[in-house]
Amino acid sequence: MNTDDFDYELDEKFIAQTPLDKRDESKLMVMDRFNGNTEIKKFYNIIDYLNPGDVLVCNNTRVIPARLFGHRPEKEEKIEVLLLQQTEDKWECLVKPGKKMKLNQVIEFSDSVSAKVVDITEDGSRILKFEYEGIFEERLDELGNMPLPPYIKEKLNDKERYQTVYSKHNGSAAAPTAGLHFTNELLEKIKDKGIYVVFLTLHVGLGTFRPVKVDDVKDHHMHSEYYTISQETVDIINRQKSKGHNIIAVGTTSVRTLETVTHNNNSKLVAESGWTDIFIYPGFEFNIVDSLITNFHLPKSTLMMLVSAFSKKEYIFDAYEKAKQNDFRFFSFGDAMFINGGRNV
């Protein structure tokens, strides 16, 4: 299976640069998972496709303002740091220009925040140990910028627009973008209809933006991301699944968490925390997820491979062509797709 098989053409005009004023007024392409039939709706119409007893599974991670700018002592050249992953009191980071930041060199971000390079990983990431006054999260809020994807050139005026309304646990370097379409009001209407809304956490890493550089899909390796799923969430999903109800994953991160856990535990969903580098591409067998809410993804990306695995690659590519014909907005701030594999109970 070749990486180029997941390529498609996309004019820059389709790439959404800013979020819509109202989250749930984005367009929604509803696609039948099993026959590829499509309908075009608004996102707030998602409730019409959910039945009482169904379960909506959301990722409640919260994006940290992980992009920092500093400089070396006595130097004016700007150093950009992107926080990837925290381990105890150290952070794995992408640093630009990386070659200049050797072991034991220091980056100053402000009078009260600096960091020292204490290790360099095999792939060139830097391990930084921060020195700061007060509480690190507060300093980060003051100094950090939202780590928007490289294809978004416009400045984001409101940091909260790159967070889901239900974001709770700090730790992501990118938003789980399918969840950006939900408003609190829409979620309340969904609950009032008898649909369960449950949460898990997967902290999204920068592997989300990293291109697939190998020709053969099977040779690609994913970066590990931390996840946790509670007993309460597991109990609701297992109970409703056993009754034949539809398990709807909000976003590819929710899919990857649920399928990681079931593949780790003989197809059973259990409460656990851990790290996942699961890579889902066509041929993958899904254990738990019936339907998927997702955005429109980059050509040749691992997310394009995941949605192609979830339905049929031909259906996905046909839907993307229809999306372009109907002026859908693509990528992180773009419109949504609902791949519906549910059964009416």
UniProtKB/Swiss-Prot annotation:
A single Gene Ontology CC term: cytoplasm
An individual GO BP term: queuosine biosynthetic process
EC assignment: 2.4.99.17
Pathway: tRNA modification; tRNA-queuosine biosynthesis
One Pfam match: Queuosine_synth
Intracellular or extracellular location(s): Cytoplasm
Keywords: Cytoplasm, Queuosine biosynthesis, S-adenosyl-L-methionine, Transferase
InterPro entries per UniProt: QueA (IPR003699), QueA_dom1 (IPR042118), QueA_dom2 (IPR042119), QueA_sf (IPR036100)
Reaction equation(s) it catalyzes: 7-aminomethyl-7-carbaguanosine(34) in tRNA + S-adenosyl-L-methionine = epoxyqueuosine(34) in tRNA + adenine + L-methionine + 2 H(+)
Annotated transmembrane regions: none
Molecular function in Gene Ontology: S-adenosylmethionine:tRNA ribosyltransferase-isomerase activity
Entry's family note: Belongs to the QueA family.
Assembly: Monomer.
Function comment: Transfers and isomerizes the ribose moiety from AdoMet to the 7-aminomethyl group of 7-deazaguanine (preQ1-tRNA) to give epoxyqueuosine (oQ-tRNA).
Record-given protein name: S-adenosylmethionine:tRNA ribosyltransferase-isomerase
Species this chain originates from: Finegoldia magna (strain ATCC 29328 / DSM 20472 / WAL 2508)
Source species taxonomy: Bacteria, Bacillati, Bacillota, Tissierellia, Tissierellales
